[in-house]
Amino acid sequence: MRRHNQIKNHNKTNELTKAFVEEILKFNKAHNIVGRFTEKEINLLDVLDCESILPYTNSAKKILDIGSGAGLPGLIIAIHQPQTEVTMSEKNKKKAYFIKRTIHTLKLTNANILDEAVTPKLITANKFDIVTARALASTSKIIKMSKHLLSKEGKFLLMKGAIEKINEEVAQLENNTYSYTIHKTKNTETNRHILEITQK
């Protein structure tokens, strides 16, 4: 019975992911919300890349995805982890509308959209176990704009590219305040990493 449920859940996840990609392609024709134009490109460069964060998010109850764009990685996390409440912030109204529409289309009850920028002045109803961002800004800038939204034991999981650039960015962090771990992603052959940052 347990294996049957696992297969059922896996099939549902695959169906939702496929439907999400179809929504991107459909919306992208008129509004250009991502720089990919084929299902293969989106699956390889976006979906697989975003799925690489999942081993590090599955114990979180509340996640904030800053500058979510087309819902990457926020909607991928919400699809794979129905037990996790995922909030996506996106100040671009067109992209925020796409996320809101996709949440409704896919019937994702654990996902919601915050259609404004995350700033040090932003107040939310809850603190978050994880703050994540993908291709948004420098590490120090992301921390500055969102550290007040992290729970006491919370952490940043930032999706980054080349290791050289990451090393440059972490060198600017306060050593007595933050500790970090760099994880090489396994889902793609591209030079991608996940930067995990916690407060000491």
Name these PLM-found stretches.
Residues I24, I77, K160, I197:
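Residue-level signal for inorganic ion chemistry
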Residues T87, A162-K200:
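Active-site capping/gating segments
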Residues I143-E153:
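A short glycine-rich, Lys/Arg-flanked "PGG" loop and its adjoining helix->strand segment in the class I
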Residues M1-A60, K94-A111:
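Class I SAM-dependent transferase core
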Residues K95-Y97, T139, I166-N167:
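Short alpha-helix immediately C-terminal to the canonical SAM-binding loop
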Residues N28, I103, L150, V170-E174:
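Conserved hydrophobic residues forming the short capping helix/wall of the S-adenosyl-L-methionine
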Residues L48-A133:
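Conserved SAM/SAH cofactor-binding pocket of Class I
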Residues E153-E164:
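Conserved beta-strand signature within the Rossmann-like core of class I S-adenosyl-L-methionine
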